[in-house]
Amino acid sequence: MAERCFEAAMTYMIPNKQSVEVFEGLLGILDPVLTSKHVRRVYQEITVSFLMISLISDQVDSKGIVRMSDSQGDDDDSLSSLTWNSKNKLWGFLVNPVPITSSDLEKRLRISCMISSNAYRIGTNVAQVRFLLRIGTFPLVLSRELGFLCPSSSRFPSVIFVSPDKQTEMLRIISSYYSVGDTEEKNCWGILGERYLTTISEDISNLVVMAFPFLQGAFHCSSVYYLNFGCKMAAEGFHAIAREELRIALSNPVLWSDCPLKRVYDSLLQRIPTGVHISHSEEKGDPTFLPLAEYCSSHRECWICGDLKLGVDRGIGADFRHLSERRTSSPDGLDAVMSAVSRMIYHHWSIPSWVSGAFKIAKFIGAH
C-alpha cells in the first residue's frame, strides 16, 4: 500500500509549492513505515530528484529558467532552526553520497549536479528542510568554514546549501579537484578537462557549470539540469561528458559498485553481448536530437538507434526494450548505453512530465 501511494504521488505531481505540501502530507501518513526497506527502495530512486526540484523551484519563467521566491526564515542559520537569512542567496548542489568531514573536504568533495548563479535565488523554509530530514532520517553536519548544511550519510545523495560569500572558495575546491580552471572572475570554467570545456558565462556571478562525477545518481542530476537550465549545454556535449563519467566509474570497481545505474547497464549488456551501434554508419552519424515538442508529437522511431518502431508502444520502456533487441557487430556497447541515457533525458524529461518520467525510470531500474 505504501509503495502504491508513493507511485501515485510521484507519477502525477508536478513539483511546485502545492505539491510539496501534498507530498509532505503523504509522508506524514506513511511516517510509521518510512524505515521499511520495501518503501525505502521506492523513494530512494525517485524522491531525491523531487526534493531537489521542490527546494529550488517555485516557478519557471518564459525562458525555462527556474527561480525561487525569497525564503521566510529568520536570521539564524543554526542547526536548531535550519533556516538561512532570507537576504542571502543560497547555492544549491546535489553531491555524491560520500561522507564529508572538514579535514578531508577539499580532497573528497565531488560535485554531481550544478553550481547555480545569482540569477537563481534559492531559498528554504522550515517545511522544506523538515521534508529533507524526514526523507533522509540521518544526522546533519554543518561545515562553518564553507557554509555547508548537508546530510552526512554515505548512502543517499545530499543537498547542500552554500552561502554566497563562500562562492569563490567552493569554485576553487572544484577547480582543484578537476585540475581545470581557476578562481579568476573572468575565466571560462570546464569540467573533465579541456576537451569537454563548456563556456556558460565569463562572469562568475552568472556561472552555471554541470558535472556528473562517476555518474552517481545521473538520472537525478540530469533531470535537475534539464529543468533548471534547459539546453544551455548542447545535448552532444552532455552526451560526451556523461559517457566519459561512465568510463571513469567503470575504471574504479568501488565507484562502479555503488553506481545506481549499474543494474541497467549490466542487464542491457548481458542481453546484448556484442554491444549495439548507435550511428549505423559513419555517413549517417548519430541520430539527431529532436526538439521536445517535435519528438513528443512524432515519436515513431527509437531515439536510441533511429529504427522505425511502427505499431509498437511508445515511451522510455519501449525504447529500452528496442535497445535490448538490437544486435550488431559493434564492440562498443558503452557508447550505445550512454547515447540511450542522454536521449532519454533530453527527450522525456520536460517540465510537465518530469515526475512521471522519473518514476518510469526508477520503475525500469527496479525491474532489472
Swiss-Prot record:
Q: What is this protein called?
A: Protein 5
